[in-house]
Swiss-Prot record:
Function field: Catalyzes the formation of phosphatidylethanolamine (PtdEtn) from phosphatidylserine (PtdSer).
UniProt modified residues of type Pyruvic acid (Ser): S254
Membrane disposition: Peripheral membrane protein
Pathway participation: Phospholipid metabolism; phosphatidylethanolamine biosynthesis; phosphatidylethanolamine from CDP-diacylglycerol: step 2/2
Subunit comment: Heterodimer of a large membrane-associated beta subunit and a small pyruvoyl-containing alpha subunit.
Cofactor or coenzyme needed: pyruvate
Reaction catalysis annotation: a 1,2-diacyl-sn-glycero-3-phospho-L-serine + H(+) = a 1,2-diacyl-sn-glycero-3-phosphoethanolamine + CO2
EC class (word): lyase
Cofactor remark from the record: Binds 1 pyruvoyl group covalently per subunit.
Family matches, as HAMAP family: PS_decarb_PSD_B_type1 (MF_00662)
UniProt keywords, alphabetically: Cell membrane, Decarboxylase, Lipid biosynthesis, Lipid metabolism, Lyase, Membrane, Phospholipid biosynthesis, Phospholipid metabolism, Pyruvate, Zymogen
UniProt organism field: Pseudomonas aeruginosa (strain ATCC 15692 / DSM 22644 / CIP 104116 / JCM 14847 / LMG 12228 / 1C / PRS 101 / PAO1)
Protein name listed in UniProt: Phosphatidylserine decarboxylase proenzyme
Subcellular location(s) of the protein: Cell membrane
């Protein structure tokens, strides 16, 4: 590891993660025209954001930076894979890793893995259906479309908010921060699907101001403690999302992790670490029994 990378990793442990994220969140929600227009224009240039596919192309039309960052796309901008039974990629970005869940652990980077149960909030019962299953981790870069969509149609069973740190998420931290994704703040969404249980985990990171879901809105319990929300109780109307429907969004980016049970899916042979992906592409197909 280079000296520059060592300094960067050291800074990750020293910086006040949540304070920085709150301050940046305030700036991202600022509606002052002189500020938000300059910030949006700088960001679009810096990260070469393609506005031609956005529903709103005019950078000055957004009420604040977060509205720009979570911008909707034009109809048809992300066609859904048509292969029978296709499991869709949930987001734009790049595959960080994908593969089997072995011995209750998920591969993070060379020399690093993390606990499946810890990712899901330390609940062994929640983790049990995914033991021996498969995972895919998708990293969303700053220039990407930042809404997350359903890989399969599913009925929401449970949502778990898991408090944690807000380490930056990139290749350097993945290779040098142990159990990165099981330490960062995250929202676990559990669904029943035609391929059995499926989890979509939205992982926060440094300067990620917030995580939202379409059914709960902003997910930030006031005391930042682990909190479980059940949606399969008789008193609640079922929440069902169709394949390709929006599930949630990041206000300033990070990572989506998808989990499946054993012998349910076979990942697209063309995908591997660092493969660029777009929401709606074929991530996997049903595994043949």
């Amino acid at each position: 590891m280079s000296f520059k990378d060592r300094l960067f990793i050291c800074s990750q442990y020293l910086l006040p993660h949540h304070l920085l994220s709150r301050l940046i969140g305030f700036a991202a929600d600022c509606r002052a025209t002189w500020f938000k227009d300059r910030l949006i224009a700088w960001f679009a240039r810096r990260y070469q954001v393609d506005m031609r596919e956005a529903q709103v192309e005019d950078l000055q039309a957004f009420e604040h930076f977060n509205a720009f960052f979570t911008r909707a796309l034009k109809d048809g901008a992300r066609p859904l894979a048509q292969e029978p039974g296709a499991v869709l990629c949930p987001a734009d970005g790049a595959i960080s890793q994908l593969g089997p869940i072995e011995h209750g652990r998920i591969f993070q980077a060379k020399g690093h893995s993390y606990s499946l149960a810890e990712l899901l909030g330390g609940d062994a019962e929640l983790a049990a259906p995914f033991m021996g299953g498969d995972f895919a981790t998708v990293y969303l870069s700053p220039r990407d479309y930042h809404r997350v969509h359903m890989p399969l149609a599913g009925t929401l069973r449970e949502m778990v908010y898991v408090p944690g740190r807000l380490f930056s998420v990139n290749q350097t931290t993945a290779e040098n921060v142990p159990e990165l994704f099981a330490r960062n703040e995250r929202v676990v969404c559990l669904f029943d699907t035609e391929r059995g249980p499926m989890a979509v985990v939205l992982v926060g990171a440094m300067i990620v101001a917030s995580i939202e879901t379409v059914w709960a809105g902003l997910v930030t319990p006031p005391k930042r403690e682990l909190k479980t929300f059940r949606y399969d109780e008789a008193a609640r109307a079922p929440i069902r999302l169709e394949k390709g429907a929006e599930l949630g969004r990041f206000k300033l980016g990070s990572t989506a992790i998808v989990l499946f049970g054993p012998q349910q899916v076979a990942f697209n042979d063309g995908l591997g670490a660092a493969s660029p992906v777009r929401m709606g592409e074929c991530l996997a197909l049903p595994k043949q029994s």
